Amino acid sequence: DSLAKDSNAAPAISSAQLIAGGDKYVAEFDSTTVTGFLKAYKVKDDGDFEASPTWEAGAKLLETGSNARKIITNYGNGTSAGVAFRWDSLPADYQTQVQTGGAITVSAANAPKVVAYVRGDQSLEGLNGLRQRDGSLLGPIVNGTPWIQGPPSAEIYGSTGYADFFAKNKARQRVLWVPANDGMLHAFNVTTGEELFAYVPGALANRLVEIPLQRGTTARTKLAGANFTSGATENQPTGTVWPYVDGNPFTADVKVTSGADSVWRTYLLGTLGRGGKAVYALDVSMSADPLTTDPAVSYLSESNAASIFKWQFTSDDDADLGY
């Protein structure tokens, strides 16, 4: 395979795994099709794991309409930086970054199609279109390791305000966070494999156009004529898996205000890894909601984008920030 600078040089099929709570979660990728797979296996009575997975998240995403998915992004920092990842919801400057901000530019008519493709719209795929995603909508999971977010820990129970936070959140569901090189950090239901939510780091805005143009060794990407891109044409080498959200996420309980009325939240911290020079933070507290037995469904939503996204720190903030 031809491998480009900053690409992920890896075998055609590779995998990493996480074992937690009697389940095994295996993340795989296939560079020949530029796709990823996330499989869950149940433990058997003899302590070994079932041979067949309970669910596979990439295939489940194919069953979910792109419009139904809950995906957010951000433009810069600030209290209103978090927005829904839908073309009409993006600030004008973000739209400009998608269209002309990177090495590959697209027309004003095609820029919204980039966002639609990343969201999972498959209408542009085909022999005369963009890269086909036949078996999975999940991107390659290469260097990033899945992370399970559980209820708050009792280890800091004595800290001011934490007892109340613990009581409100001790029954919250576990969430499986997975970074993927489809430009997203995904949140999955650990029991069903359904996607609960996804986040597209705003630092990737000017590179999103690359995602539908990647080719696997099956060479199934053919540009829609010569009109999808303007200026530079497709330049991703065959068989290359380019990194986007390629770093490890983790969650921790954080005291966001001090004093007698201390407030605690659960934050997720993540990086782009080899995908770029950026660190981000999300508020994923998912406090119990009396209106639903599934708090992740009610809190992790596009309407809460401004509350979920907290901040990003990139090489624009500090030139010494590395990969």
Question: Model features per residue range: what roles?
Answer:
Residues 1-323:
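A fold-level detector for beta-propeller and closely related beta-sheet-rich head/sensor domains
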